[in-house]
Amino acid sequence: MKFTIMSKGDQSSDALASTMKEYLLDFGFIMDEQEPDIVISVGGDGTLLYAFHRYYNRLDETAFVGVHTGHLGFYADWLPTEVEKLVIAIAKTPFQVVEYPLLEVIIRYVNGSKESQYLAMNEATVKSAEGTLVTEVEIRGEYFETFRGDGLCISTPSGSTAYNKALGGAIIHPSIEAIQIAEMASINNRVFRTVGSPLVLPKHHTCVLKPTAGMNLQITVDHLTMVHQDVKSIQYRVANEKVRFVRFRPFPFWKRVRDSFVADK
Protein backbone atom coordinates (compact mmCIF):
# COMPACT_ATOMS: atom_id res chain seq x y z
CA MET A 1 0.00 0.00 0.00
CA LYS A 2 1.20 3.50 -0.85
CA PHE A 3 1.02 6.40 1.60
CA THR A 4 2.09 9.97 2.08
CA ILE A 5 2.13 12.27 5.10
CA MET A 6 1.32 15.98 5.16
CA SER A 7 2.49 17.93 8.21
CA LYS A 8 1.40 21.28 9.59
CA GLY A 9 5.07 22.22 9.59
CA ASP A 10 5.65 22.95 13.26
CA GLN A 11 8.27 21.04 15.25
CA SER A 12 5.94 18.58 16.98
CA SER A 13 3.97 17.80 13.81
CA ASP A 14 7.13 17.25 11.77
CA ALA A 15 8.53 14.94 14.46
CA LEU A 16 5.36 12.85 14.51
CA ALA A 17 5.26 12.71 10.71
CA SER A 18 8.87 11.51 10.62
CA THR A 19 8.15 8.82 13.22
CA MET A 20 5.08 7.57 11.36
CA LYS A 21 6.98 7.48 8.09
CA GLU A 22 9.71 5.30 9.60
CA TYR A 23 7.17 2.93 11.16
CA LEU A 24 5.18 2.51 7.94
CA LEU A 25 8.30 1.95 5.85
CA ASP A 26 9.36 -0.73 8.33
CA PHE A 27 5.99 -2.42 7.76
CA GLY A 28 6.70 -2.53 4.02
CA PHE A 29 4.52 0.39 2.95
CA ILE A 30 5.64 2.55 0.02
CA MET A 31 6.01 6.32 0.30
CA ASP A 32 4.35 7.88 -2.76
CA GLU A 33 3.49 11.58 -2.84
CA GLN A 34 1.94 11.41 -6.31
CA GLU A 35 -0.53 8.52 -6.08
CA PRO A 36 -1.05 7.57 -2.43
CA ASP A 37 -3.72 5.16 -1.25
CA ILE A 38 -3.75 6.80 2.17
CA VAL A 39 -2.92 10.41 3.05
CA ILE A 40 -2.06 10.98 6.71
CA SER A 41 -2.55 14.55 7.89
CA VAL A 42 -0.57 15.64 10.96
CA GLY A 43 -1.64 18.98 12.39
CA GLY A 44 -5.16 20.34 12.53
CA ASP A 45 -8.29 20.45 10.42
CA GLY A 46 -6.60 23.11 8.29
CA THR A 47 -3.80 20.69 7.45
CA LEU A 48 -6.33 18.10 6.33
CA LEU A 49 -8.04 20.72 4.15
CA TYR A 50 -4.69 21.37 2.45
CA ALA A 51 -4.26 17.62 1.97
CA PHE A 52 -7.72 17.33 0.44
CA HIS A 53 -7.02 20.09 -2.09
CA ARG A 54 -3.64 18.55 -2.89
CA TYR A 55 -5.32 15.27 -3.91
CA TYR A 56 -8.78 16.44 -5.00
CA ASN A 57 -8.21 14.94 -8.46
CA ARG A 58 -7.94 11.37 -7.15
CA LEU A 59 -10.63 11.16 -4.47
CA ASP A 60 -11.82 7.75 -5.70
CA GLU A 61 -8.37 6.26 -5.08
CA THR A 62 -7.24 8.14 -1.97
CA ALA A 63 -8.54 8.07 1.60
CA PHE A 64 -7.56 10.45 4.42
CA VAL A 65 -6.82 10.03 8.11
CA GLY A 66 -5.83 12.76 10.53
CA VAL A 67 -3.66 13.10 13.63
CA HIS A 68 -4.27 16.26 15.64
CA THR A 69 -1.31 17.93 17.28
CA GLY A 70 -3.62 20.60 18.69
CA HIS A 71 -7.12 20.13 20.07
CA LEU A 72 -9.35 17.37 18.71
CA GLY A 73 -10.94 18.36 15.41
CA PHE A 74 -13.83 17.32 13.21
CA TYR A 75 -11.66 15.56 10.63
CA ALA A 76 -9.18 13.76 12.88
CA ASP A 77 -9.73 11.29 15.69
CA TRP A 78 -6.14 10.32 16.49
CA LEU A 79 -3.98 12.03 19.11
CA PRO A 80 -0.16 12.23 19.15
CA THR A 81 -0.04 9.65 21.94
CA GLU A 82 -1.86 7.18 19.67
CA VAL A 83 0.52 7.28 16.71
CA GLU A 84 1.88 3.76 17.26
CA LYS A 85 -1.66 2.41 17.62
CA LEU A 86 -2.66 4.13 14.36
CA VAL A 87 0.34 2.75 12.47
CA ILE A 88 -0.42 -0.78 13.67
CA ALA A 89 -4.07 -0.34 12.68
CA ILE A 90 -3.07 0.80 9.18
CA ALA A 91 -0.66 -2.11 8.82
CA LYS A 92 -2.74 -4.89 10.35
CA THR A 93 -6.43 -3.95 10.14
CA PRO A 94 -8.68 -3.88 7.06
CA PHE A 95 -10.01 -0.35 7.31
CA GLN A 96 -13.49 0.96 6.65
CA VAL A 97 -14.08 4.08 4.59
CA VAL A 98 -16.59 6.78 5.47
CA GLU A 99 -17.66 9.15 2.69
CA TYR A 100 -18.65 12.80 3.20
CA PRO A 101 -20.44 15.02 0.65
CA LEU A 102 -18.60 17.86 -1.06
CA LEU A 103 -19.63 21.19 -2.58
CA GLU A 104 -19.14 21.85 -6.29
CA VAL A 105 -18.53 25.48 -7.31
CA ILE A 106 -18.59 26.56 -10.97
CA ILE A 107 -17.78 30.18 -11.90
CA ARG A 108 -18.79 31.39 -15.36
CA TYR A 109 -17.69 34.66 -16.94
CA VAL A 110 -19.29 37.42 -18.99
CA ASN A 111 -16.61 37.31 -21.70
CA GLY A 112 -17.18 33.61 -22.30
CA SER A 113 -13.75 32.53 -21.10
CA LYS A 114 -13.30 29.05 -19.66
CA GLU A 115 -15.28 28.44 -16.49
CA SER A 116 -13.51 27.84 -13.17
CA GLN A 117 -14.50 24.75 -11.20
CA TYR A 118 -13.70 23.92 -7.57
CA LEU A 119 -14.53 21.41 -4.84
CA ALA A 120 -14.98 22.50 -1.23
CA MET A 121 -14.83 20.23 1.79
CA ASN A 122 -16.02 22.89 4.29
CA GLU A 123 -17.52 25.89 2.55
CA ALA A 124 -17.34 28.51 -0.16
CA THR A 125 -18.11 32.19 0.36
CA VAL A 126 -18.72 35.14 -1.91
CA LYS A 127 -18.39 38.84 -1.10
CA SER A 128 -17.99 42.03 -3.07
CA ALA A 129 -14.37 43.16 -3.20
CA GLU A 130 -15.51 46.79 -2.89
CA GLY A 131 -18.59 46.90 -0.62
CA THR A 132 -22.11 45.51 -0.55
CA LEU A 133 -22.74 42.32 -2.49
CA VAL A 134 -25.76 42.56 -4.78
CA THR A 135 -26.73 39.35 -6.51
CA GLU A 136 -29.77 37.54 -7.81
CA VAL A 137 -30.29 34.13 -6.27
CA GLU A 138 -31.80 31.32 -8.34
CA ILE A 139 -32.78 27.92 -6.95
CA ARG A 140 -33.53 25.07 -9.34
CA GLY A 141 -33.54 27.52 -12.24
CA GLU A 142 -36.16 29.81 -10.69
CA TYR A 143 -35.61 33.34 -9.37
CA PHE A 144 -35.70 33.25 -5.56
CA GLU A 145 -34.55 36.65 -4.30
CA THR A 146 -32.10 39.52 -4.76
CA PHE A 147 -29.56 39.45 -1.96
CA ARG A 148 -27.96 42.63 -0.63
CA GLY A 149 -25.48 42.40 2.20
CA ASP A 150 -21.92 41.45 3.16
CA GLY A 151 -21.97 38.06 1.46
CA LEU A 152 -23.17 34.47 1.35
CA CYS A 153 -21.69 31.27 2.75
CA ILE A 154 -22.46 27.92 1.13
CA SER A 155 -21.36 24.96 3.23
CA THR A 156 -21.19 21.19 3.20
CA PRO A 157 -22.65 19.11 6.06
CA SER A 158 -19.20 18.51 7.55
CA GLY A 159 -18.45 22.23 7.13
CA SER A 160 -21.72 23.24 8.80
CA THR A 161 -19.91 23.34 12.16
CA ALA A 162 -17.44 25.98 10.92
CA TYR A 163 -18.20 29.45 9.46
CA ASN A 164 -21.79 28.43 8.77
CA LYS A 165 -22.45 27.87 12.47
CA ALA A 166 -21.02 31.29 13.33
CA LEU A 167 -23.55 32.77 10.89
CA GLY A 168 -26.45 31.05 12.65
CA GLY A 169 -26.72 28.11 10.28
CA ALA A 170 -27.83 24.64 11.27
CA ILE A 171 -25.47 21.76 12.01
CA ILE A 172 -26.12 18.99 9.47
CA HIS A 173 -25.00 15.38 9.82
CA PRO A 174 -22.53 14.40 7.04
CA SER A 175 -24.68 11.41 6.07
CA ILE A 176 -27.17 13.90 4.59
CA GLU A 177 -26.25 14.89 1.03
CA ALA A 178 -27.06 18.59 1.06
CA ILE A 179 -25.62 22.09 0.97
CA GLN A 180 -26.57 25.04 3.16
CA ILE A 181 -26.78 28.73 2.26
CA ALA A 182 -26.27 31.22 5.10
CA GLU A 183 -26.44 35.01 4.87
CA MET A 184 -23.77 37.43 6.04
CA ALA A 185 -25.40 40.62 7.36
CA SER A 186 -28.19 40.92 4.79
CA ILE A 187 -29.93 44.27 4.26
CA ASN A 188 -33.62 44.01 5.13
CA ASN A 189 -35.99 46.99 5.20
CA ARG A 190 -39.15 48.21 3.46
CA VAL A 191 -37.31 48.41 0.14
CA PHE A 192 -34.96 45.41 0.21
CA ARG A 193 -35.93 41.99 1.46
CA THR A 194 -34.31 38.54 1.73
CA VAL A 195 -35.59 35.31 3.25
CA GLY A 196 -33.38 36.01 6.27
CA SER A 197 -32.92 32.34 7.11
CA PRO A 198 -30.42 29.62 6.22
CA LEU A 199 -31.55 27.40 3.34
CA VAL A 200 -30.78 23.68 3.06
CA LEU A 201 -30.75 22.33 -0.50
CA PRO A 202 -30.80 18.57 -1.15
CA LYS A 203 -28.78 16.79 -3.76
CA HIS A 204 -29.70 17.69 -7.36
CA HIS A 205 -30.97 21.14 -6.27
CA THR A 206 -28.74 23.87 -7.68
CA CYS A 207 -28.20 27.42 -6.43
CA VAL A 208 -26.97 30.00 -8.96
CA LEU A 209 -25.84 33.51 -8.04
CA LYS A 210 -25.94 36.23 -10.70
CA PRO A 211 -24.07 39.25 -9.32
CA THR A 212 -24.49 42.82 -10.51
CA ALA A 213 -22.48 43.48 -13.68
CA GLY A 214 -19.03 44.97 -13.18
CA MET A 215 -18.69 43.83 -9.58
CA ASN A 216 -15.34 42.37 -8.49
CA LEU A 217 -15.93 39.38 -6.23
CA GLN A 218 -13.87 37.95 -3.41
CA ILE A 219 -14.52 34.21 -3.50
CA THR A 220 -13.22 31.66 -1.04
CA VAL A 221 -13.15 27.87 -1.34
CA ASP A 222 -12.13 26.45 2.03
CA HIS A 223 -8.75 28.11 2.76
CA LEU A 224 -8.30 29.44 -0.80
CA THR A 225 -9.10 33.13 -1.43
CA MET A 226 -9.45 34.58 -4.93
CA VAL A 227 -10.69 37.77 -6.60
CA HIS A 228 -12.70 37.20 -9.78
CA GLN A 229 -13.75 39.84 -12.31
CA ASP A 230 -16.46 39.81 -14.99
CA VAL A 231 -18.38 37.04 -13.25
CA LYS A 232 -21.61 36.08 -14.98
CA SER A 233 -22.75 33.45 -12.48
CA ILE A 234 -21.62 31.15 -9.67
CA GLN A 235 -23.24 27.74 -9.44
CA TYR A 236 -23.34 25.65 -6.27
CA ARG A 237 -24.56 22.09 -5.80
CA VAL A 238 -23.73 18.83 -4.05
CA ALA A 239 -20.75 17.42 -5.93
CA ASN A 240 -20.72 14.01 -7.55
CA GLU A 241 -17.37 13.40 -5.87
CA LYS A 242 -17.02 12.55 -2.18
CA VAL A 243 -14.12 12.72 0.25
CA ARG A 244 -13.21 9.42 1.89
CA PHE A 245 -11.94 9.04 5.45
CA VAL A 246 -10.25 5.96 6.89
CA ARG A 247 -11.96 4.64 10.01
CA PHE A 248 -10.47 2.08 12.38
CA ARG A 249 -12.85 2.85 15.25
CA PRO A 250 -16.14 4.71 15.86
CA PHE A 251 -15.94 8.49 15.54
CA PRO A 252 -19.53 9.67 16.21
CA PHE A 253 -20.35 13.03 14.64
CA TRP A 254 -22.66 14.20 17.44
CA LYS A 255 -20.05 13.36 20.07
CA ARG A 256 -17.62 15.58 18.19
CA VAL A 257 -20.22 18.36 18.17
CA ARG A 258 -20.82 17.97 21.89
CA ASP A 259 -17.11 17.86 22.73
CA SER A 260 -16.44 20.96 20.62
CA PHE A 261 -19.35 23.20 21.61
CA VAL A 262 -21.10 21.88 24.73
CA ALA A 263 -18.91 19.74 26.98
CA ASP A 264 -16.73 21.26 29.68
CA LYS A 265 -13.05 21.30 28.77
Curated annotation (Swiss-Prot):
Query: Is Nucleotidyltransferase among this UniProt entry's keywords?
Result: no
Major localization listed first in the record, in broad terms: cytoplasm
Q: Which GO terms describe its cellular component?
A: cytoplasm
The family this protein is said to belong to: Belongs to the NAD kinase family.
Q: Which UniProt keywords apply?
A: ATP-binding, Cytoplasm, Kinase, NAD, NADP, Nucleotide-binding, Transferase
Provide the binding site for NAD(+). Answer: D45, G46, N122, E123, R148, D150, A185
Indicate where this protein resides in the cell. Answer: Cytoplasm
GO annotation, biological process: NAD metabolic process; NADP biosynthetic process
Q: What gene name is given for the protein in this entry?
A: nadK1
What this protein needs as a cofactor is: a divalent metal cation
UniProt GO molecular function: ATP binding; metal ion binding; NAD binding; NAD+ kinase activity
**EC code:** 2.7.1.23
The protein's annotated catalytic reaction(s) are: NAD(+) + ATP = ADP + NADP(+) + H(+)
Catalytic residues, chain numbering: D45
Cited function: Involved in the regulation of the intracellular balance of NAD and NADP, and is a key enzyme in the biosynthesis of NADP. Catalyzes specifically the phosphorylation on 2'-hydroxyl of the adenosine moiety of NAD to yield NADP.
What enzyme class is recorded for this protein?
transferase
The lineage's top-level taxon is Bacteria
Asked whether the UniProt record includes NADP among its keywords, one would answer yes
List the protein's name. Answer: NAD kinase 1
